[in-house]
């Protein structure tokens, strides 16, 4: 599974069905071994190193590491994939630069390891058209008859005109004035924060983004659900964090233009529970939007733009949620960029992973595969962010205890690290640099843990701020 929010939701459902925790192993970054028993800790490590439990719930990160990472703990898990059934949920979220590597992995498993692969998605990517396509046959498990499809239609996607931020806010206010609850999903945190701050006629409004720690987001989602259940006319302005794994339903949705897969995922939060005959999701192209640092979103947005132009003269693609439109979108997405972009380019080596792992055809009698170099340079998620403990709710107490643990009590530190898991925000280098310059972050010499000690950089509405709120205080 790609997202921790999806894992949390699905893991709970699986446990309820299986009703035997001994059969299930969760292996992802949010799972912490709560026991101080050394034997239990060793058993946990053994399980995660070898994936010996009958049911493994893990992330795409761990799965791809099993194939391509140089770490022995990752390689050891590979044998567990043989003769297994592997379900990839939300497969459309596989990063664009890893499509070829993903195809190699599942093709090998299906062809040589007697492994059954199930790819789940509302917007199934056409992996047969990737630079290095699937080498195994892929069949649809579920095909809806034409006469049945209409019965499942809960939402209509409407392409609106291009607007600036003020136009989006005015459009949103018009919807609010019609007494609908509303979800607005943006491509960046700054866009979401600006729109949130400018909406002023909502009965209740909320903001969601990765600028908030996990526990903060969970608390906001709980408030949103409660308000929706009580017929409060809610407005939520969010980034992509709400697109999957969040079970909420709004009467109207605005999605700033992005990839069609993201648009359809967002539309899944519209009339989700069938509260009305039909819900409406509006696509708005934001004028002057800068997505240079978010190439996957930018590429998807460009492919969607091209498809939307085509809908004007080709009725075949009028319904953006149809299989024909989804296939057309992916065809444009894959062909709009160089095929090698899907092969995991490593800039410091001037080569991609496919080149490193391919045998040199010029040396017929020499196996010339750079497996170690490839593994050392393989990272599913770009590891240029820093995890910072933030002072949200109990996070403030945890930071205080970290600071008072001056003599480095190991057991206390381990306990604090476990408790801090839900109070962490990922910061990019430029954010950390600013916080360090303002002396708002403390780095613990004993552990290297970053603590946000200036309360003015974190608030209950927006999470981690770009600029300090001077009404708050320092630790």
What does each of the following model-derived ranges do?
Residues 20-68:
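Inter-Walker segment of RecA-like/P-loop motor cores
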Residues 2, 90-130:
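Conserved helicase ATPase motor motifs in RecA-like P-loop NTPase domains
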Residues 25-40, 187-190, 205-221, 237-243:
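Conserved helicase motor
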Residues 50-70, 228-243, 255:
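Conserved two-lobed SF2 helicase motor
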Residues 1-18, 29-31, 126:
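Conserved Walker A/P-loop ATP-binding site and its immediately adjacent core
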Residues 116, 122-176:
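Interdomain hinge/linker at the junction between the two RecA-like core domains of SF2 helicases
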Residues 110, 170-179, 185, 190-200, ...:
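C-terminal helicase lobe and adjacent C-terminal extensions/tails of nucleic-acid helicase motors
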Residues 61-63, 72-109:
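SF2 helicase catalytic motif II
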């Amino acid at each position: 599974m790609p997202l921790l929010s999806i894992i949390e939701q699905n893991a709970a459902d699986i446990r309820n069905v299986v009703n035997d925790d001994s059969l299930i192993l969760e292996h992802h970054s949010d799972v912490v071994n709560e026991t101080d028993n050394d034997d239990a800790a060793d058993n946990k490590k053994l399980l995660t190193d070898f994936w010996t439990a009958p049911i493994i719930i893990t992330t795409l990160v761990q799965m791809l590491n099993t194939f391509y990472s140089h770490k022995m703990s990752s390689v050891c898990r590979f044998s567990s994939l043989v003769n297994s059934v592997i379900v990839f949920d939300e497969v459309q979220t596989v990063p664009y630069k890893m499509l070829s590597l993903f195809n190699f992995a599942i093709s090998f498993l299906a062809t040589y390891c007697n492994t059954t692969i199930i790819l789940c998605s509302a917007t199934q990517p056409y992996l047969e058209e990737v630079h290095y396509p699937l080498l195994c046959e892929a069949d649809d498990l579920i095909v809806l008859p034409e006469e049945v499809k209409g019965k499942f239609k809960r939402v209509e996607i409407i392409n609106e005109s291009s607007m600036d931020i003020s136009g989006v806010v005015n459009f949103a206010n018009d919807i609010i004035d019609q007494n609908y609850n509303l979800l607005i999903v943006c491509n960046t945190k700054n866009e979401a924060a600006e729109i949130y701050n400018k909406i002023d006629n909502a009965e209740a409004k909320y903001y969601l983004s990765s600028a908030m720690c996990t526990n903060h987001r969970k608390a906001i989602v709980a408030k949103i659900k409660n308000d929706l259940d009580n017929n409060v006319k809610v407005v939520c302005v969010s980034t992509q964090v709400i697109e999957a794994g969040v079970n909420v339903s709004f009467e109207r949705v605005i999605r700033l233009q992005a990839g069609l897969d993201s648009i359809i995922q967002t539309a899944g939060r519209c009339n989700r529970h069938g509260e009305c005959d039909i819900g409406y999701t509006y696509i708005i192209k934001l004028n002057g939007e800068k997505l240079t640092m978010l190439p996957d979103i930018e590429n998807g947005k460009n492919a969607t733009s091209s498809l939307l132009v085509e809908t004007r003269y080709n009725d075949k693609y009028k319904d953006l949620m149809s299989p024909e439109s989804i296939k057309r979108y992916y065809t444009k997405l894959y062909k709009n960029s160089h095929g090698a972009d899907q092969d995991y380019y490593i800039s410091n080596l001037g080569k991609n992973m496919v080149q490193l792992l391919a045998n040199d055809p010029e040396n017929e009698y020499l196996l010339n595969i750079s497996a170690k170099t490839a593994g050392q340079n393989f990272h599913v998620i770009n590891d240029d962010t820093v995890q910072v403990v933030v002072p949200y709710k109990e996070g403030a107490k945890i930071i205080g205890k970290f600071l008072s643990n001056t003599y480095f009590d190991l057991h206390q530190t381990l306990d604090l690290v476990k408790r801090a898991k839900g109070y962490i925000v990922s910061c990019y280098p430029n954010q950390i640099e600013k916080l360090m310059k303002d002396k708002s972050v403390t780095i613990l010499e004993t552990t290297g843990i970053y603590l946000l000690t200036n309360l003015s950089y974190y608030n209950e509405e927006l999470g981690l701020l770009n600029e300090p709120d001077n009404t708050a205080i320092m630790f």
